[in-house]
Amino acid sequence: MALKGLDWSGFHAPTLDDIEALASAALAALPEPFKSLSAEVTCSVAEFAEDDIIAHFGMESPFELMGLFTGIGMTHDGAVPHTGQFPNTVFLYRRAILDYWAEHDEDTLGDIVTHVLIHELGHHFG
């Protein structure tokens, strides 16, 4: 039975593109020198982490992982990419982020995306 007075027909969950836009805004707002030092780090948004990643970390559910840094951190010779090296990448996982957002109404979605992104960038910086 639908509740009268609540028309949700025009509302949809934030998309992968929406999360990517929030992440791009967070990256653009980074202060120097962090902005320039993270310029080569790519950001990718997916629904969930791959099953092998969830298993690697011993997690029971893909909802447990909101973000992941892959690559070689700056303190481990990752400041300058080597031939054949994949770029350092921050992965953001949309469904886990949205689930966290639904459970923690004191934070905006932008705040959560920014927090996860900065946490993962911390691994880039060592």
Question: Where are the regions a protein language model picked out?
Answer:
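Short alpha-helical catalytic segment bearing the HExxH-like zincin motif
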Residues: 112-120
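Active-site rim/adjacent substrate-binding subdomains
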Residues: 1-112, 124
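Catalytic Zn2+-binding segment of zinc metalloproteases
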Residues: 120-126
